[in-house]
């Protein structure tokens, strides 16, 4: 399931904001929204994986895919100056107050209502959030999506796209039924039912 930036098209239009493709444009859009009384970015960071997604994009766009993979494999320490540069970019969003207030007390789902009711304009999130946006009344007319913008020119635009998988443990005591269960889960009709809840492809 891919990640990126979901945004309120109508709020962007009302404030004369075009979809940002560079970091400077993104930060400028945040400043315009903040000045208009709109929280630029909603987030729920009660469970920290949501902030990991933001970090991943900042690092991928600042240092590139190969660096990011080496960092996450432990081959490069988080004390590396290039990682400091990532947090410097994050500071450009945190210090001016571009994230939702009190986000540390909210789960990711609880950060969706501010965007639905127009208090916030963007959410860096996966496509599983779309079902909740639409349940809240947003439509394709006012809900848009854009690629996280470029930070370091020339670095290829790698994407955040986790994959959820299910496996049988090597030491499982009932591998026969576990295999039957995985076969059941892989049926098209079961996948269709699961995806009604998960909101994923």
What is the role of each PLM region?
Residues 42, 121-126, 144-146:
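Paired acidic/hydrophobic, glycine-rich loop segments that form the ligand-binding mouth/hinge
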Residues 1-19, 27, 38, 45-71, ...:
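Periplasmic solute-binding protein
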Residues 14-15, 88, 96, 135-200:
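Extracytoplasmic/periplasmic substrate-recognition and gating elements
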Residues 11-12, 31-35, 109-123:
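Short helices/loops that flank or line small-molecule/ion binding pockets
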Residues 23-28, 101-116:
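Short helix-initiation/N-cap motifs at beta->coil->alpha
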Residues 30-32, 73-104, 148:
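Glycine-centered hinge/linker elements that transmit conformational signals in sensory
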Residues 45, 62-85, 135-138, 150-159:
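Short, solvent-exposed loop/beta-turn-alpha elements that line the ligand-binding surface or hinge
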Residues 14-19, 73, 92-107, 119, ...:
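A local structural motif
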């Amino acid at each position: 399931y891919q990640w990126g930036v979901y945004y309120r098209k109508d709020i962007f239009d009302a404030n004369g904001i075009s979809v940002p493709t560079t970091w400077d444009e993104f930060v400028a859009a945040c400043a315009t929204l903040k000045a208009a009384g709109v929280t630029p970015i909603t987030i729920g960071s009660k469970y920290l994986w949501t902030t990991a997604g933001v970090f991943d994009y900042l690092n991928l766009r600042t240092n590139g895919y190969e660096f990011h993979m080496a960092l996450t494999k432990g081959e490069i320490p988080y004390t590396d100056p290039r990682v400091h540069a990532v947090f410097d970019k994050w500071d450009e969003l945190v210090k001016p107050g571009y994230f939702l207030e009190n986000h540390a007390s909210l789960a990711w789902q609880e950060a969706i209502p501010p965007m639905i009711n127009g208090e916030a304009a963007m959410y860096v999130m996966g496509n599983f959030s779309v079902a909740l946006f639409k349940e809240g009344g947003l439509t394709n007319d006012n809900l848009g999506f854009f690629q996280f913008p470029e930070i370091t020119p020339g670095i290829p635009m790698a994407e955040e796209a986790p994959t959820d998988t299910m496996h049988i443990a090597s030491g499982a005591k009932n591998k026969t039924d576990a295999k039957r269960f995985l076969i059941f889960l892989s049926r098209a009709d079961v996948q269709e039912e699961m995806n009604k809840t998960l909101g994923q492809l």
